[in-house]
């Protein structure tokens, strides 16, 4: 069997943060793009919220290609949610955030996955509407790990990537780079190119990389990754979880 860097992006860390830092937040609204990944995240969020005794007052799906969210947002607003959780891609969530402002929808917490991981989303909605929106990703260039391998630190990886390609790396590109680093480390550890020896070296690996801690479970999936939760504060991405790389605290209040 193979080795995989894929690890489900779950909603437990955001839910834990809200339950701990904002226990007064009880009413959750979920609006999900009707597509495999965004809908899976939304369903996990629903489970995670209910597990903590939160009241999911609204759960709706929107079709791929939706441009007008007015009806869904109006219905959501009527439920007076304290935490709005939306899933989709960059264009979806730029439009949604702007239309939330048009309807003067505000809440203590607004989480959007996965668009705020991209600078394009922050630029698209502007600093004012991005303020205090939270998100999560498998990895983000704002994280800070001091790792082994050819790149060493996250900062160095991001610097080298920007010098080569002229853009910020996202989690897809970083995971590809991490896979190369991990394979190199496994070959060095095995002292061989023999497939079985390299695989055994991978299976027993426990290292820190620019991507984060790397350790694999019996099923071949990475089980050490703590996907960062972050918040846009004053136009910048601030990591608020995990504690080992936390750069700031959760700020409440997302307005118009």
Enumerate the language-model features and the residues they cover.
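Extracytosolic ligand-binding ectodomains
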Residues: 1-256
């Amino acid at each position: 069997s193979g080795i995989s860097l894929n690890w489900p992006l779950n909603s437990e860390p955001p839910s834990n943060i809200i339950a701990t830092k904002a226990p007064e937040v009880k009413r959750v609204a979920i609006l999900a793009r009707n597509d495999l990944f965004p809908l899976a995240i939304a369903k996990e969020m629903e489970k995670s919220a209910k597990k903590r005794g939160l009241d999911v007052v609204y759960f709706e799906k929107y079709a791929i290609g939706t441009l007008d969210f007015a009806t869904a947002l109006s219905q959501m607003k009527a439920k007076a949610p304290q935490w709005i959780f939306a899933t989709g891609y960059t264009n979806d969530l730029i439009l949604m955030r702007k239309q939330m402002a048009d309807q003067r929808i505000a809440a203590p917490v607004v989480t959007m996955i996965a668009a705020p991981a991209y600078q394009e989303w922050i630029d698209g909605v502007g600093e004012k509407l991005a303020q205090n929106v939270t998100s999560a990703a498998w990895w983000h260039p704002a994280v800070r790990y001091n790792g082994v391998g050819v790149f060493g630190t996250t900062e160095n990886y991001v610097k080298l990537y920007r010098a080569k390609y002229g853009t910020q790396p996202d989690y897809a590109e970083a995971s590809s780079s991490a896979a190369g680093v991990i394979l190199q480390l496994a070959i060095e550890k095995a002292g061989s190119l023999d497939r079985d020896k390299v695989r055994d070296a991978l299976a027993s690996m426990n290292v820190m990389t620019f991507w984060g801690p790397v350790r694999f479970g019996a099923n071949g999936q990475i089980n050490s990754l703590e996907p960062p939760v972050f918040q846009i504060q004053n136009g910048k991405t601030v990591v608020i979880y995990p504690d080992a790389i936390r750069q700031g605290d959760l700020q409440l209040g997302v307005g118009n």
